[in-house]
């Protein structure tokens, strides 16, 4: 079995990623800030162990890697937070929290894992979960788009520097996904209908849409895909002209 580490494993998207990997020849280290959250995922899955660590804390992540028996073949940086509100209303602490978790946390987890891959001569894969906000930032979400576009830039830099060791680094940018931190947003029937209709495929995405993309990028079939961001959004970021009047 291959070894995977998934951060943010306690959420809906994290659970689906862990589930997909655990059913496809991976032993999964399900990581969340609180052990109770990671246990909610691991208790429902085979081949999955729960771990608690703070992705923002380098020592916490080093300790995590020492607890996991095997060097990872795959790292999925899925942990992320948002502090909603317009920029004028954002506190500096809000901004810093999002940057620390989404960008710096991903840097710490990926770098510590990659060091171990290199030491063990393991040609692994790292997948960073970004967002369509990294392509077209939306208002009212504070530092979130900035961290996601920064994470894509970090993805490309990691891929360039670590490619010589056989480590591939890619990103996945989810669109309107009915899971995780977006799920409460889509519980409003009006929002759910309008957002679904805005997508060329006429539906919201599911957590499985992202989990399946993770599985593909981690596979041998994707062995020559590197330094890329796969946008999984049903085409919504390219749909602006669909919604403008033509006469």
How should these model regions be labeled?
Residues 163, 168, 225-227:
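Short, small/polar-rich loop/turn modules that mediate ligand/substrate recognition or access, typified
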Residues 226-247:
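Short C-terminal tail/terminal secondary-structure segment
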Residues 10-11:
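Conserved glycine-rich cofactor-binding loop
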Residues 171, 190-221, 225, 232-234:
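C-terminal helical subdomain
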Residues 86-87, 94-99, 195:
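Substrate-binding pocket helix/loop in short-chain dehydrogenase/reductase
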Residues 110, 147, 155:
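Active-site helix of classical SDR
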Residues 131:
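Residue(s) in the substrate-gating loop at a strand-loop-helix junction
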